Amino acid sequence: MRSFRAVRNFSTTAKRLSQAPKASTPNASSGNGFVLAFVAAAAGAGAYYYYANSPAAKVETFNATKADYQKVYDAIADKLIEDDDYDDGSYGPVLLRLAWHSSGTYNKSDNKFGSSGGTMRFKPEASHAANNGLVNARNFLKPIHEKFPWISTGDLYTLGGVTAVQELGGPIIPWKRGRVDEPESASPPDGSLPDASQGATHVRNVFNRQGFNDQEMVALIGAHALGRCHKQNSGFEGPWTFSPTMFTNDFYKLLLDDKWQWKKWDGNPQYEDVKTKSLMMLPTDMALATDKNFKKWATAYAKDQDLFFKDFSAAFSKMLNNGVDFPQGTEIWEFKPKNA
């Protein structure tokens, strides 16, 4: 496999190097507690990590192969099993949320933001209200990054989401390496992610900005098959399904088949299921049941889990890749699940 030279706009790379922390402080952190001492870049067939002790930065080469990235995947998967002291016994849902939120800032009008820069590691993006609670995912991945310092933060966060979906029973997610960590100044503006209190028009506006059509929007919101909301983080509370650590199409089934009512409580307006009052739906979720075109796709996914898996895989892979300047010839990889 041919290794590459760091030739992607070397002058730009050199400027980024001046932003890199010193190699002697591998655990240095910003306000959010997760700035590692390596700035990683990946292109072609290899991954590079480098450090700067002076303006004249040194470059260290690591020729990472697919097998090396599989080791990162496996380490995340193993830790998901070993470290079960989190919501419903799994960090998987919050890893998916980290990957989703890191990528969902993309703006197709100027091809900026998205997962490429790994800027969720900095306080400005990490402190956006929509990202409350994601410190748990970043801290979960911190020892993985220390073990594999050559992988960029953007690649690690997105690979964490891929691992979560696959290890919790979801579809295989095609993935590409090559995200280049950017300095804090590259952080996206607040307000780029969906506001869960809104309706169909807002959903379309946010996802259209990223280049998604109605079908892709509905598939991506199906990520709510996993996890739960926390009042202290978002103002909403509860899981969407009875199996929040299993990736299924139950989200759509429950949304369309159950009866829902407004929850009477002191948090943000949300829906609860009439029968058990233990499940929740967000106003943006309910838009999938009330908007004619959204409902068409939600109904299709409720009836056919294989179709949902296929469409989610394609849409989520697209989301992870949006805004990334992959070197020409970068391969698309699929990783073998540990639970296979």
Swiss-Prot record:
GO terms for biological process: cellular response to oxidative stress; hydrogen peroxide catabolic process; response to reactive oxygen species. Residues 175-198 are annotated as: Disordered. Binds 1 heme b (iron(II)-protoporphyrin IX) group per subunit. CDD domains: ascorbate_peroxidase. The active site is at residues 101, 240. One of its GO terms (cellular component) is mitochondrial intermembrane space. Pfam families: peroxidase (PF00141). Keywords: Heme, Iron, Metal-binding, Mitochondrion, Oxidoreductase, Peroxidase, Transit peptide. It is an enzyme of class 1 (oxidoreductase). It is found in: Mitochondrion matrix; Mitochondrion intermembrane space. PROSITE patterns: PEROXIDASE_1, PEROXIDASE_2, PEROXIDASE_4. The record marks 97 as: Transition state stabilizer. Destroys radicals which are normally produced within the cells and which are toxic to biological systems. Belongs to the peroxidase family. Cytochrome c peroxidase subfamily. This is Cytochrome c peroxidase, mitochondrial. The lineage of its organism: Eukaryota, Fungi, Dikarya, Ascomycota, Saccharomycotina.
